[in-house]
């Protein structure tokens, strides 16, 4: 199918608790979070998940999550990486608008972002019809270092609710 696209959503790995001296934006990954991000990276590499375009929130924890994927060897060739301030705590609608702006030549895209928006976007894309175990897990929660993979059979500009087929739900805790 000519318009088939792959979308990967990844919530950043576990970050340090908010401290008085550190803004939410600047919270780094914990040691456990860095290990979880590396595990997700290895799982992505093993599954052949290497998106062409990576849209990443500029927060420290999302940037460190991306760096862990890169260090795990996810990409043989460097992807087009776009740090987007609009992804910091973005709503599902804001993320859909960003995806709608992707050119059709982009076969595979990834967003590395934050809850609650990322979880809500994943739930909206997958819809509520299917009761496959992956859908049930998606409906329940979207913990840190969780990845979902979707196939989308429409042009990027038409991405919307119930527009995707959930292919994979993978939480780092599944890999420990």
PLM region spans:
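Residue-level preference for the first positions of well-ordered beta-strands
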Residues: 7, 108-110, 147
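A glycine-rich beta-strand to alpha-helix segment
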Residues: 106-128
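Active-site-proximal alpha-helix that buttresses catalytic centers in soluble enzyme cores
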Residues: 2-86, 127-131, 142, 176
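Domain-level recognition of soluble alpha/beta enzyme cores
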Residues: 126-165
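Short, solvent-exposed aromatic-acidic interface loops
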Residues: 164-175
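Glycine-rich phosphate-binding loop signature in dinucleotide/nucleotide-binding domains
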Residues: 47-49, 102-107
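Terminal, non-globular segments
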Residues: 36, 93-97
